[in-house]
Regions:
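Non-heme Fe(II)/2-oxoglutarate
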Residues: 2-14, 19, 23, 36, ...
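Double-stranded beta-helix
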Residues: 153-209, 232
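Conserved double-stranded beta-helix
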Residues: 92-161
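Active-site rim elements
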Residues: 81-86, 186-191, 212
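A general structural signal for short secondary-structure junctions and capping/turn motifs
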Residues: 41-42, 133-138, 150, 192-195, ...
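Short loop segments at secondary-structure junctions
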Residues: 54-55, 148-152, 164-165, 228-231
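N-terminal auxiliary "cap/dimerization" subdomain that precedes the catalytic jelly-roll/cupin core
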Residues: 1-105, 196-197
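Conserved hydrophobic/aromatic beta-strand scaffold that supports enzyme active sites
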Residues: 48-50, 143-147, 191-193, 201-203, ...
Length: 236
């Protein structure tokens, strides 16, 4: 590693450390600052209230092909946004625009199915099944999750904490990969499970709310879309 590379590594480490130490975030401080500036510039809301809703999936077909398949998960990436997601976005467009701004972007519309993990892998990060936050693009993003089947406790529900609960438990959540996360079982009194009927959906900012997948007894199917403000991503 050259001297310049060491300096760059140091600056990136500091960028992350500021956010972890003072902002309860796993994102880089420079990206959070950018989000803050644009939020003020466009007079957007700082907070987004988690939304739970219901949709009609009668005309939705689960894709028969996959683009990524492992022993424990598989996914299909859509080139176009499915109509069911367009309707949900339209139903909540004002709230989404007040938070992300107008002309927000979507990325990675995905059908995702997870399968049962053997006990030896439950503490390994196989398919985001340890507590984490989506830290790659600042702290302004929304994810919409739609259940493609009825989900109960043994169906591997998505598990999450709201923002206040994330802050409250930050000492244990500050890093994604740590020794104690691998060898201790951290559940939280405040955690919530996304249980429900086929077609139920959840809208949440996964960059500020800690969350994880859980292992189903057999499998669990969901449809997922990421929404970003237009200053975060190139629209291509």
């Amino acid at each position: 590693m050259t001297f310049v590379e060491r300096i760059k590594y140091f600056l990136i480490s500091v960028d992350f450390s500021i956010s972890k130490s003072f902002l309860f975030s796993q994102s880089r401080f420079s990206k959070i600052l950018k989000d803050f500036i644009y939020t003020k510039l466009y007079l957007l809301r700082n907070n987004f209230t988690i939304i739970l809703g219901k949709s009609d999936l009668n005309d939705f077909e689960i894709p028969k092909e996959t683009v990524f398949h492992t022993k424990y998960s598989k996914c299909y990436l859509y080139k176009e946004c499915p109509e069911i997601l367009k309707k949900i976005i339209k139903d909540h467009q004002n709230k989404i625009e007040n938070y992300l701004g107008k002309n927000f972007l979507f990325e990675k519309v995905m059908y995702y199915e997870t399968f049962n993990l053997p006990e030896i892998l439950l503490k390994e990060d196989v398919y985001s099944n340890i507590w984490h936050m989506d830290s790659h693009d600042g702290n302004k993003l929304l994810k919409i999750f739609i259940l493609l089947q009825d989900v109960e406790d043994n169906d591997g529900p998505f598990v999450y904490l709201d923002r206040l609960s994330t802050k409250k438990n930050w000492r244990k959540l500050v890093n994604r990969w740590t020794f104690d996360k691998k060898f201790l079982n951290y559940d939280y009194d405040e955690q919530k499970k996304f249980l429900g009927k086929k077609g139920d959906y959840l809208i949440i900012n996964t960059s500020i709310c800690s969350h994880r997948a859980s292992s189903p007894k057999v499998s669990r199917k969901m449809l997922v879309i990421d929404l970003f403000p237009r200053w975060t991503k190139n629209n291509n």
